[in-house]
Amino acid sequence: ISRYDILVNRYKELVSEKLSRKDFIEYNEILFSAHSCAIEGNSFSVDETRTLKEKGLGMIPKGKTLLEAFEILDHFQAYEYLLKNLDRPLTEELLKETHRLLTEHTLSYKTQYDEIPSNPGEYTTVDMCAGDTIFGDHEQLIKQVPRLLQSTQQVLDSGKIHPMIIA
């Protein structure tokens, strides 16, 4: 963590202290959204993500899909919701609302051919996997969510563990 703290201080010197609070928040929202969506296969660059933030659906670059644009716009919505709710404790309500916002315009499209459709803001009704990772019995995992949220909130409240370690 000491290396992390050194990097954070250097980042503050080079980037964040040179921006207004509003600009810094928007800068992070754009970077976070672009890179988070890229992990899921979205091909928007950071610059294209910034332009989409500024101009909305009126600007979809050549070769990009409406689905990709909606993924990023939904991500913006979820990011802004969480930013406005930083003081709220971690609850299933917060988790589900974040998921609803994050997938509002894309989940039904992505799962339209699935036998069991998924709904934004709701837990899965089937066991899930990603690549060669199988996550286990979805019903058992769902039962553990309240305990996970509560224990994570307790650790955050205690301030004894650095948030980056918790993440």
Feature names for model-found ranges:
Residues I1-A167:
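FIC/Doc superfamily catalytic core
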